[in-house]
Amino acid sequence: MTDISELYASLFTDFRGATHRVRARQYVEGLLGVDGRKTVANIAAAVGDPQDEQRLRRFVSGAAWSWDLLRRALARTVTTRAGEGRGAWVVLPVSIPKNGDRSVGVTRHYCPERERVVVGQQAFGAWFATQERLVPISWRLLRGSSETDRVAAVRELVTEVAEWTGDRRPVVVDPGALPVTDPARQPWERCPLMVRVDAGVGLAVAPQVVPGHAAAPVAPASQALTSVGRLSVASRGVATVPAALPAGGPGPLTALGVWPGGRVGGRPEEVWLSDVPAARPASLGALARLPRRVAGGWRTRGAAVGLADFEGRSLPGWHRHMTLASCAYAVDELAGDQLERQRSGLCAA
């Protein structure tokens, strides 16, 4: 069981002054205690002193503390508790609908989850995930919608988490099926990477994978995986084939196909490329399922702790709010039982 006080001490260890540690804890406790939208006014009221509203507002949007240091402490805290080598990083895009353009980074963009154009923010989040736990760690707000913007955001996040932890946990990137142009070229060399790609991306595969070719053909990933799926007994709805990018680059790679319902047949629903060493198909399949769990965490606990609730034009304010809301998510995930007992005790009193 994780003690909440010890958890806060670990998260806020890099704040230089006691005042910042107090404000950070107030803000996180307010995020955990407020029902409904997590405005600064509601957060201040939840922690018992509405007069703290201006102090908390300045702490988030006007103070000089580094959100990177807090994110680093959050990453260190959750990976240490998971145990050496356990877990993976998951990089996932999210859409945050907003009413009007009064907040930073608001654009009109297509939201795959809602299957329509929405007005709101687009962001990428880096989450730490094990089979039991999920915690958001770091964020990038997109200021444009081009592929270049998205690739840059992915690259920054992958580089960041690799540097913060200094380990080689796999990084799973599901940026909405980016084509493989240069999804994360430099970070690919720093940590094992698994990237969801467009099913039509060309891969160099062994001749026996695609019938009728004497030399190593270049085939669409979905075709190669459909062929190998017919030739082998796939595990839990996944099949793999050794592959390489025709133009060279990182390698050797494994292409992974994922089929719905646990049965291989026809065109795969998802295609992934991986350089995770010595990974079995079932292990790669487990990694490929992590983004769905993260998306569920974003919709449920993420909404409950206010990850989508920041209002304001300050980009530093957005980053600080997202970081503190990520800390609130971690506290609820790691010490939720203790929180419930505290709430029950308050209600009984």
What are these regions (language model features)?
Residues M1-E6, L11-H20, W139, R143, ...:
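A short, flexible helix-boundary coil/loop motif
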Residues M1-R58:
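Gly/serine-rich nucleotide phosphate-binding loop at the start of the catalytic core
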Residues I43, G87-P97, A126, R169-A177, ...:
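Short, conserved catalytic/metal-binding motifs centered on acidic residues
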Residues R58, E113-R168, V264-E269:
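Electropositive, glycine- and tryptophan-enriched low-complexity nucleic-acid-binding patches
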Residues V60-I137:
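Active-site-proximal, Lys/Arg-enriched surface segment
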Residues G144-P252:
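An internal, acidic/charged active-site-proximal segment
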Residues G249-L290:
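Long, acidic, intrinsically disordered low-complexity segments
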